[in-house]
Amino acid sequence: MITIARPLLLALLLSCSVGHPASAAPSSRSTASDIVSEADCFSMGSYDQWMAGLRAKNGLLKSLLIRWKFPEDEFTRHRRNLDCRAITYRSDGHLVRGWLVRPKHGASTGKLPVIVYNRGGNRGYGALTFAHLFTHVFPLAESGYVVAASQYRGVMSAQDAASSPDQFGGDDVRDVTNLLRIVSRLPGSDPDNLFMLGQSRGAIMTFRALRETTLPIRAVAIYSGVYDLHDLLAMRPAFDGLFEVLIPDYRRHRKAELDKRSVTRWPGQLPPRTGVLMIHGDEDERAPLRSARTFAVELDRLGRPYKLVVHPGESHFLDGVRPEVHAQTLQWFERFRQRPGQ
């Protein structure tokens, strides 16, 4: 099914580089004990103290832009309604940073559905800051979900980046599958209602994790996803040099490594009942829309549940239709959510 949605007015893109990502560590059993440290996301104190910290780190102009985008009443509402933690968790012997956000008031059943959010970018670029949570994570948690997000390995420190580097969808996929297992076992999480959301490169992490995890994932949503690295290289040839840095044995096994990270090459290996929502802008200059359309054709051929939503006039970040994208995602997840007694 392909739906063409109408855009809203284009919103101002703000790149927020503040906050404190979480830390993490490894384990074979993936229980709550794999969270080795956690800290309150709002530990900076008041809204004014947060703004003062932003000014000191990013300068006056950027702090004013962030103040405009995230007003004090929004900060206060999230602080009142959400339990937000910067965490460090264990993943195969590595310490990995992340975020864990839950509604403070829970659900009448005592169990809440879970979303694992898979970010875009590589290494430190695209890492989720506290300010990013306002756009990407808090709205999902306010809608009644436990939301966990990984920074992926290699983001703890320069030493960590050298000893456990980002592989752009290689061994680092285990950071997602381990986080899924950890958060599904936390008190208040509903292990029967697990979902994933991937943005840009996060699509690679989402689909590889979906193929490899033993946990039942009910549905996934992908924003501006990378579905085929061959198409990405055709669109952005400079990525060839980046892949040589990030992907082990890239020059010797180039096609095999690209195929491994390209869901268009193995759609039949995905769980047949997991619903796939794809949201893309038709002016995306970073991730090719044609890959999403190719993947949609394959899912249709296989008879899999899916939906492709294309927003006219929208770029990679979908800023002009963010409320619509959020609503479309929640509607999709609700469609596949298991209710008590089902």
For the regions a language model picked out, list residue spans one by one.
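Short beta-strand/loop motif that positions the catalytic acidic residue
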Residues: 277-280, 284
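Mobile cap/lid helix-loop segments that gate and shape the active-site cleft of serine hydrolases
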Residues: 127, 226-269
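Short substrate-entry loop that stabilizes the transition state in hydrolases
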Residues: 107-112, 117-159, 229-230
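C-terminal catalytic histidine-bearing segment of alpha/beta-hydrolase fold enzymes
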Residues: 293-342
